[in-house]
Regions:
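ATP-binding glycine-rich loop module of kinase domains
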Residues: 11-37
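Conserved short submotifs of the Hanks-type protein kinase catalytic core
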Residues: 65-77
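The N-lobe alphaC helix and its flanking beta3-alphaC-beta4 segment of protein kinase-like domains
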Residues: 35-50
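Conserved small/polar residues in nucleotide/adenosyl-binding loops
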Residues: 176-178
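Pre-DFG segment of protein kinase catalytic domains
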Residues: 169-172
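Conserved kinase catalytic-core helix
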Residues: 80-115
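An alpha-helical support segment within catalytic cores of ATP-dependent transferases
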Residues: 106-153, 158-164
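Short beta-strand micro-motifs within the conserved protein kinase catalytic domain, predominantly
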Residues: 56-67
Length: 178
C-alpha cells in the first residue's frame, strides 16, 4: 500500500484519508484508540449485511505504527457538490436524499449499539445541567419507541456519493447506531 501526499483526500485532527488505487485508506493518528478503528470496521461490516450501498471493508492494518482502515473507493460526486453546482435541481436532490434516508431507516441491524443508550450517556455527562433537567431529558428519551432500525448519526449530503449511473452510496459510517 503506497500512501502519497498527493493522494490525500482530507486531513482531520485525528486522521488522514488517502485515495489508494481502488481503495480509501483512513490512517488514524498514533494516539487514536485501536478499539475505535476496529469498531468502525465492525460497524461497517454490520451495515454491509443490511444491503445498503456502502464502501465495503477491505482490511484493518498498521501503517508506519498507525492504525489504518481500508475500504472500497466509490467513484462519483458528493450530493452536496451536486446541490451546490446544480441549484435548479435542488428539489430533486432533496427528494432523492430523503428517499435514501427512509431506505436507511428501513434497515435493521440488531447487533449495533443503541442510539438511546448513547444519548443517555451524553445526557448523564452534562454536569452543567441540573439533575432535574437531566432527569426530564432522560424520561423523554426513555419514552421514545424501542426498535433496531439503522440511524446514520451524521446523515448529510456530504456523506452521500452519487455515481455516474445515479446510484447513491452512503459513506462515513462511524456514528451509525440503532
Amino acid at each position: 500500500m503506497k500512501l502519497e501526499e498527493n493522494n490525500i483526500i482530507v486531513k482531520r485532527s485525528y486522521k488522514t484519508v488517502y485515495k489508494c488505487d481502488d481503495s480509501i485508506v483512513k490512517v488514524f493518528n498514533e494516539e487514536h484508540p485501536k478499539s475505535d478503528v476496529f469498531n468502525e470496521a465492525l460497524i461497517t461490516a454490520r451495515i454491509e449485511e443490511t444491503g445498503l450501498d456502502i464502501p465495503k471493508v477491505k482490511g484493518v492494518s498498521l501503517v508506519e505504527g498507525k492504525w489504518a482502515l481500508e475500504i472500497e473507493y466509490k467513484d462519483g460526486k458528493t450530493m452536496e457538490d451536486m446541490m451546490n453546482s446544480d441549484k435548479k435541481n435542488i428539489e430533486k436532490y432533496m427528494e432523492d436524499f430523503v428517499d435514501l434516508q427512509l431506505q436507511i431507516h428501513g434497515k435493521t441491524s440488531p447487533l449495533l449499539k443503541g442510539m438511546k443508550d448513547k444519548l443517555a450517556r451524553q445526557i448523564n455527562s452534562l454536569k452543567d445541567l441540573d439533575a432535574t433537567t437531566r432527569y426530564e431529558l432522560l424520561t423523554r428519551l426513555e419514552s421514545m419507541p424501542k426498535h433496531n432500525k439503522v440511524c446514520h448519526g451524521d446523515f448529510n449530503p456530504s456523506n452521500v456519493i452519487v455515481g455516474k449511473n445515479g446510484k447513491m452510496t452512503v459513506v462515513d459510517l462511524s456514528l451509525i447506531h440503532i
